[in-house]
């Protein structure tokens, strides 16, 4: 329960709590009102013990610190962070105008309207880049419009707390978000956050002007191929200036892709530009209450359980992946597989809607039943070994858990040592059938996947 005053809806003598706006695995979001200024806010209430237990504390601390650097009129603002023994409270700017792309769903925007939103988007992204902050996941859900018609970017700095909009997370995310991701992210060659954000801005501009995506196909691999080659056509109603700009931004080569600074220098971008937009690209001196010492916010404040879980969090911390990382890990979706040889027989991947602790517990049970010993368990990785040496030494198997969302995980299991045939037999006969209770879907089996045969050839 939230720590409220006696009248039942005043939080820490500062905010009146209103209706529930939404909720996720770790957080509930309420409409709130500052009782001194009467300003409407959004209050995200985080369960402290839950985030300690899954090892998200360090990441959240970093991201709160980031929020101090990105105070801009076109970015949803974090006003304040407060904490009690059991809860953490994020007081955020309340944006009630809805998503920008709800407007696009009603029909494409006129050039002047699209330009205004694009100017605000690019201005905010450039501001963040100047402070070493990169979004890397600009997409429709992250673009809101306030009651004055101004663009507001969400999840700059608080992405770890963003809830999946649908419970199955990955399934819908892979169908929606990849259309906005840069070719270099898909190809797993490493990428520059600045250039990735620039590409996404280009896709967003196209959608605002066209009313549809530049890269779309019912086959995900075909869509990735189009993205990799920047294979798209501008509709007839695009002006020549817009065509040139979009083509230079959606350059599949990040080295020659038009940088944001150059975008802002183009005649098309500067047309009708509000000079205040650029002038406001100066960090404000307005204080951010309670952010001076992030660690104070996350102190146990007398909660022994929180302290104990914090001490243990490094051992249980999972690698946090966004949808693109997951897609890249999946052989069926990985474009690098078109150019590089991979040995599918030595590893397997599946997604699960179970908690990390439940997955680990199941893996330990499977290891025991398969006569494997768990030698090491840290950072979301379980290292398992056989009891005796085979033809090529002791069989060693690693299982690593990656977090997609707090309630959705990817598990990768691969042979680390020993005989491949021995591993394949053990996997097919014992391990894979035993894991079926926690599997949402097997990854990378589109071409050779068959009904479960429990080891029959």
Swiss-Prot record:
| Catalytic residues, chain numbering | 137
Query: Which EC class, in a word?
Result: transferase
Question: Which molecular-function annotations from GO does this UniProt entry contain?
Answer: ATP binding; protein serine kinase activity; protein serine/threonine kinase activity
Which superkingdom is the protein from?
A: Eukaryota
> Where is ATP annotated to bind?
21-29, 44
Q: Does the keyword Cell membrane apply?
A: no
What keyword terms does UniProt attach to this protein?
A: ATP-binding, Kinase, Manganese, Nucleotide-binding, Serine/threonine-protein kinase, Transferase
Cofactor(s) the protein requires to work: Mn(2+)
E.C. no: 2.7.11.1
- Region entry PPI, spans: 345-374
Q: Could you tell me the Gene Ontology terms of the biological process aspect for this record?
A: signal transduction
Reactions this protein catalyses: L-seryl-[protein] + ATP = O-phospho-L-seryl-[protein] + ADP + H(+); L-threonyl-[protein] + ATP = O-phospho-L-threonyl-[protein] + ADP + H(+)
Domain Protein kinase: start-end pairs: 15-269
Q: Please give the SMART domains that the UniProt record associates with this protein.
A: S_TKc
Gene3D superfamilies given in the database record: Kinase associated domain 1, KA1, Phosphorylase Kinase, domain 1, Transferase(Phosphotransferase) domain 1
| Purpose of the protein | CIPK serine-threonine protein kinases interact with CBL proteins. Binding of a CBL protein to the regulatory NAF domain of CIPK protein lead to the activation of the kinase in a calcium-dependent manner.
| UniProt free text on domains | The activation loop within the kinase domain is the target of phosphorylation/activation by upstream protein kinases. The PPI motif mediates the interaction with the ABI (abscisic acid-insensitive) phosphatases.
User: What PANTHER family would the database entry show?
Assistant: CALCIUM/CALMODULIN-DEPENDENT PROTEIN KINASE KINASE-RELATED, CBL-INTERACTING SERINE_THREONINE-PROTEIN KINASE 15
Entry's family note: Belongs to the protein kinase superfamily. CAMK Ser/Thr protein kinase family. SNF1 subfamily.
What name appears for this protein in its UniProt entry? CBL-interacting protein kinase 18
Q: Which organism is it from?
A: Oryza sativa subsp. japonica
Q: What is the lineage of its organism?
A: Eukaryota, Viridiplantae, Streptophyta, Embryophyta, Tracheophyta
Q: Which gene encodes it?
A: CIPK18
């Amino acid at each position: 329960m939230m720590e409220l005053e006696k009248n039942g809806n005043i939080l820490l003598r500062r905010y009146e709590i209103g209706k529930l706006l939404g909720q996720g695995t770790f957080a509930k979001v309420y409409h709130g009102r500052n009782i001194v200024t009467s300003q409407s806010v959004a209050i995200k209430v985080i369960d402290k013990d839950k985030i300690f237990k899954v090892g998200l504390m360090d990441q959240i601390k970093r991201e709160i610190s980031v929020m101090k650097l990105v105070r801009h009129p076109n970015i949803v603002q974090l006003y304040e962070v407060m904490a009690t023994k059991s809860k953490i409270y994020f007081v955020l700017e309340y944006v009630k105008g809805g998503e920008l792309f709800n407007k696009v769903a009603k029909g494409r925007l006129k050039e002047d309207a699209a330009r205004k939103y694009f100017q605000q988007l690019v201005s905010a992204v450039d501001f963040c880049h100047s402070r070493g902050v990169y979004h890397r996941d600009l997409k429709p859900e992250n673009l809101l419009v306030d009651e004055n018609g101004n663009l507001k970017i969400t999840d700059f700095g608080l992405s770890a707390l963003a809830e999946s909009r649908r419970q199955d997370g990955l399934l819908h995310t892979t169908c929606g978000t990849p259309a906005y991701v840069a070719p270099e992210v898909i190809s797993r060659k490493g990428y520059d956050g600045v250039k990735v954000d620039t590409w996404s801005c280009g896709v967003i501009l196209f959608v605002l002007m066209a009313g549809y995506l530049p890269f779309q196909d019912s086959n995900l691999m075909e869509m990735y191929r189009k993205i990799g080659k920047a294979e798209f056509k501008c509709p007839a109603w695009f002006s020549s200036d817009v065509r040139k700009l979009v083509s230079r931004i959606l350059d599949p080569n990040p080295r020659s892709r038009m940088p944001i600074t150059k975008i802002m220098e183009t005649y098309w971008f500067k047309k009708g530009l509000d000079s205040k937009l650029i002038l406001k690209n100066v960090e404000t001196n307005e204080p951010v209450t309670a952010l001076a010492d992030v660690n104070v916010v996350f102190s146990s404040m007398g909660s022994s359980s929180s302290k104990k879980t914090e001490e243990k969090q490094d051992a249980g911390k999972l690698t946090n992946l966004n949808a693109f990382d997951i897609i890249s890990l999946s052989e069926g979706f990985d474009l690098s597989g078109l150019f590089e040889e991979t040995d599918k027989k030595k590893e397997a991947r599946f997604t699960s809607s179970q908690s990390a602790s439940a997955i680990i517990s199941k893996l330990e049970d499977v290891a025991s039943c398969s006569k494997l010993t768990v030698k090491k368990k840290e950072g979301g990785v379980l290292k398992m070994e056989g009891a005796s040496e085979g033809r090529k030494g002791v069989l060693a198997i690693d299982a690593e858990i990656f977090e997609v969302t707090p309630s959705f995980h990817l598990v990768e299991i691969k042979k680390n040592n020993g005989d491949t045939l021995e591993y394949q037999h053990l996997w097919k006969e014992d391990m894979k059938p035993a894991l079926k209770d926690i599997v949402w879907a097997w990854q990378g089996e589109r071409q050779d996947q068959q009904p479960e045969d429990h080891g029959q050839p």
